[in-house]
């Protein structure tokens, strides 16, 4: 039997957010409650027109549909990240539905027919199974018996009838104690349009002009009609006053009940606090008596007095005697430190005198003349170059030798053929006369370019160390100061010191700090920078071809340097140092592991394969991280797993070890396995190095490491098919989400990869690689922008279907990879390709150009051989 009770329509906008208010009407998840009997609405008006209108409205009594607006939907986490004040917009009028629209809207909604006693609501709330109580809108419970719908946590819907407050007062007291009012929500019924009223047959008379109606005198109203009208108005006014009085009495009654309830609760809390206070007083008195008795017993015990005396003696010994000895030792150590600092200052003064060319006799004469002007001393110190000097091992006095060993080419690995260029620079110092005798001009400057961390500074030190010459190193940012003329003065001082200590190497790090193109910066700061650069240009030209001083500079931005600075004659050699390859990375790892306790079975090749794209500084840090982890675990040797784990830390960050549910692990595993399974079917991306679902450095997802051709993917030499393969791989997580969870359960885990696919598809179209040849010319015309998006969408749909086809064909492989990832959290290259061989179903790769050429050549040889055999047979 269906639930029957009349409901008034209420706006659903009170349950919806401002963004969703403009979308009504809409098919929300709903529960229908149908009323099979028409409800007659009777008014007290006696007017015939009012009765006619009332009868017309009664025709609209149709089955009522209740739409439950859930107020407990889970809010997304990103909604709390930023709260902004929303502008108030004018509320749009709600559209009413016709009778046919309302029937279509409520056609397939279920009918609630299951009943429960109203007392079961209290037990369901106590057990935590109650989710919502749906009540008619614009009505207040407790006044009279009202039918309601009960929604449980398992989405079941039941119906019951709640009693009035007078009928069951104890029920409503328990209702308030459990706080069920919070879970009450209003039902919603969309408004219905009234049917059109047919116009009367004499309706054309209404078109008569108004001034003609003035000729007809209105009929005088009778006394009976006037009395009825007055009585009707009095009745309406009395009825309205009674309703207002009833509402006020109800509000006052509710306030009185709440006040009484609060007063009772306040008395209960006061009684509880008083009881606790009295108990605490009794407990305190008892503890006080117990402590007094205990101290009295201890005071009378001689053993306790002896023990306390020993304790106080020990404290006195620790505080007085030992502290005195410690202070005495600290005083002696402080004297030793002061003596060592005095010796160090003396050595530093001697070193400064040596650098400035001041002899000891001159110092003694100057000491007799009196103290120098402190401002003059500060100015002289400020005008020095500030370069760090490292003397050659055969030129420096023994007391000034550095404790560290000079850097050699054996300390620098992963150079390849670049090392030959630098060895020639060393020969310019060691066999310079041989080059001059044959008329070979020795370069005056060498510019080292390359990404950060490839070892440009280390190479410059190795050149100076192999040549055995003095090495001056300075950062280009030290040339520029706020005072006018300081930069140029420091450049002159630097090259003056280098010339006095020739042969030598001047190394300028980060040359782009002072070598930018002139004229870009206006004002005094730009003039000072330009003056410093001009002095550097003159200093570089002054030593050209003499071989006494060679300048080596390093920069990450050779494109912004001044053309006059990098022209031949100043920097004759421009050496680009790229990131190391596979063999170079292996050599760098071996160099940094020379002084570390390495295991005998360490696989440097596996570590080098995992560190594709890393530079020397990152590889050195990997070895250090692995050594620290070894010490932390209490082991004595570094293994391959230590280096591989350190490589992951360097690339992706530290491991995030917070707990996750099994379903979350499985969803992330499906996302990563889909990319790997689809990529293994494409020739440019089939080299899968590593799979993991372990989150690192705050990233909730895992990653798939694919070794790709650097020239193709970094230098922009991708073919059309390679870009389509890339788009297919990026859409694989979305396709897997649809295949494994269905279209209704899609998540946003693949949002980032799908955005990458959209960007790649648009780049493919704008690059002129699509079927419609967009991007060749005038593609920013307004009427073609939509065509570009349509073409990009076609490419995305094609690649998406391709990804679904590959995943459907390899469903067994996907399930196995997902299970392994959920268990082990990571898969190596060998483990992944073992699963591919056992469960994979991939199409054969298309033949390459070389293979096609070989096949054609074999066919041609067979054809020529048959032709020769036929000719020989005919001649015989």
Curated annotation (Swiss-Prot):
Would the keyword Disulfide bond turn up in this protein's UniProt record? no
**Which ranges are annotated Basic residues under compositional bias?**
258-275
Q: Where is the composition biased (Polar residues)?
A: 8-19
State the UniProt keywords alphabetically. ATP-binding, Chloroplast, Hydrolase, Membrane, Nucleotide-binding, Plastid, Protease, Transit peptide, Transmembrane, Transmembrane helix
Q: Where is this region: Disordered?
A: 1-20, 256-276, 350-370
Q: Name one GO molecular function term.
A: metalloendopeptidase activity
Q: What is this protein called?
A: Probable inactive ATP-dependent zinc metalloprotease FTSHI 2, chloroplastic
Organism listed in the record: Arabidopsis thaliana
Name the gene for this chain. Answer: FTSHI2
């Amino acid at each position: 039997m269906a639930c029957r009770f009349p409901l008034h329509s209420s706006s659903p906008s009170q349950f919806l957010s401002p963004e969703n208010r403009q979308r009504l009407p809409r098919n929300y998840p709903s529960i229908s409650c149908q009323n099979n009997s028409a409800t007659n609405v009777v008014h007290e008006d006696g007017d015939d027109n009012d009765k006619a209108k009332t009868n017309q409205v009664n025709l609209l009594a149709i089955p009522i549909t209740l739409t439950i607006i859930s107020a407990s939907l889970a809010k997304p986490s990103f909604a709390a990240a930023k709260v902004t004040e929303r502008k108030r917009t004018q509320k749009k009028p709600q559209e009413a539905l016709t009778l046919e629209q309302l029937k279509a809207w409520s056609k397939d909604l279920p009918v609630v027919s299951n009943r429960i006693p109203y007392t079961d609501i209290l037990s369901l709330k106590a057990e935590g199974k109650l989710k919502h109580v749906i009540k008619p809108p614009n009505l207040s419970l407790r006044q009279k018996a009202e039918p309601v719908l009960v929604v449980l946590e398992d989405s079941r819907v039941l119906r019951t009838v709640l009693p009035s407050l007078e009928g069951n007062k104890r029920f409503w007291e328990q209702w308030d104690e459990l706080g069920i009012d919070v879970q009450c929500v209003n039902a919603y019924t969309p408004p219905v349009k009234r049917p059109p009223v047919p116009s009367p047959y004499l309706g054309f008379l209404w078109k008569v002009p108004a001034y003609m109606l003035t000729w007809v005198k209105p009929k005088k109203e009778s006394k009976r009609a006037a009395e009825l009208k007055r009585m009707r108005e009095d009745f309406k006014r009395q009825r309205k006053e009674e309703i207002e009085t009833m509402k006020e009495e109800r509000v006052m009654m509710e306030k009185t009940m709440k006040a009484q309830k609060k007063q009772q609760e306040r008395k209960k809390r006061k009684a509880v606090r008083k009881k606790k206070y009295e108990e605490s007083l009794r407990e305190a008195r008892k503890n006080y008596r117990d402590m007094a008795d205990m101290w009295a017993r201890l005071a009378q015990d001689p053993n306790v007095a002896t023990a306390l005396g020993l304790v106080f003696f020990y404290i006195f010994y620790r505080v007085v005697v030992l502290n005195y000895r410690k202070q005495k030792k600290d005083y002696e150590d402080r004297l030793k430190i002061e003596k060592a600092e005095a010796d160090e200052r003396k050595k530093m003064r001697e070193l400064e005198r040596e650098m400035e060319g001041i002899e000891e006799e001159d110092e003694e004469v100057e000491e007799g003349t009196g103290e120098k002007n402190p401002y003059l001393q500060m100015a002289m110190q400020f005008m020095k170059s500030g370069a760090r000097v490292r003397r050659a091992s055969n030129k420096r006095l023994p007391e000034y030798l550095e404790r560290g060993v000079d850097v050699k080419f054996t300390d620098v690995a992963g150079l390849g053929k670049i090392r030959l260029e630098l060895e020639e620079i060393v020969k310019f110092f060691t066999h310079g006369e041989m080059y001059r005798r044959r008329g070979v001009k020795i370069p005056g400057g060498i510019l080292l370019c390359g990404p950060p961390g490839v070892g440009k500074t280390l190479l410059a030190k190795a050149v100076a160390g192999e040549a055995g010459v003095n090495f001056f190193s300075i950062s280009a940012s030290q040339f520029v100061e706020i005072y006018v003329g300081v930069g140029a003065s420091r450049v002159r001082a630097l090259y003056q010191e280098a010339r006095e200590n020739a042969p030598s190497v001047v190394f300028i790090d980060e040359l782009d700090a002072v070598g930018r193109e002139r004229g870009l910066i206006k004002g005094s700061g730009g003039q000072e920078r330009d003056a410093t650069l001009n002095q550097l240009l003159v200093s570089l030209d002054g030593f050209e071809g003499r071989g006494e001083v060679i300048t080596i500079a390093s920069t990450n931005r050779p494109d912004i340097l001044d053309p006059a600075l990098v022209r031949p004659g100043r920097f004759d050699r421009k050496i680009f140092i790229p990131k190391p390859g596979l063999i170079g990375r292996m050599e760098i790892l071996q160099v940094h592991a020379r002084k570390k306790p390495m295991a005998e079975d360490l696989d440097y090749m596996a570590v080098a394969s995992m560190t594709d794209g890393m530079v020397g500084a990152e590889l050195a840090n990997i070895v250090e991280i692995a050594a620290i982890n070894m010490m932390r675990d209490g082991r004595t040797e570094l293994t391959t797993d230590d280096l591989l784990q350190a490589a992951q830390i360097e690339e992706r960050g530290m491991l995030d070890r917070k707990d996750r549910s099994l379903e979350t692990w499985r969803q992330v595993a499906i996302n990563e396995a889909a990319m790997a399974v689809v990529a293994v079917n494409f020739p440019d991306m089939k080299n899968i190095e590593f799979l993991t679902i372990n989150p690192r450095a705050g990233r909730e997802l895992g990653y798939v490491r694919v070794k790709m051709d650097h020239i193709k993917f970094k230098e922009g030499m991708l073919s059309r098919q390679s870009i389509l393969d890339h788009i297919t791989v990026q859409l694989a997580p979305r396709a897997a989400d649809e295949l494994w969870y269905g279209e209704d359960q899609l998540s946003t885990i693949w949002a980032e990869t799908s955005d990458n696919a959209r960007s790649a598809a648009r780049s493919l179209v704008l690059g002129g690689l699509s079927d419609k040849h967009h991007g060749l010319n005038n593609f920013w015309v307004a009427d073609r922008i939509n065509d570009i998006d349509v073409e990009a969408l076609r490419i995305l749909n094609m690649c998406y279907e391709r990804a679904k086809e590959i995943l459907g064909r390899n469903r067994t492989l996907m399930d196995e990879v997902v299970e392994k990832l959920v268990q082990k959290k990571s898969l190596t290259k060998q483990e992944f390709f073992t699963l591919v061989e056992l469960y994979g179903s991939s199409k054969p790769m298309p033949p390459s150009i070389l293979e096609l050429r070989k096949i054609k050549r074999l066919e041609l040889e067979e054809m020529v051989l048959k032709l020769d055999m036929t000719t020989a047979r005919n001649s015989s």
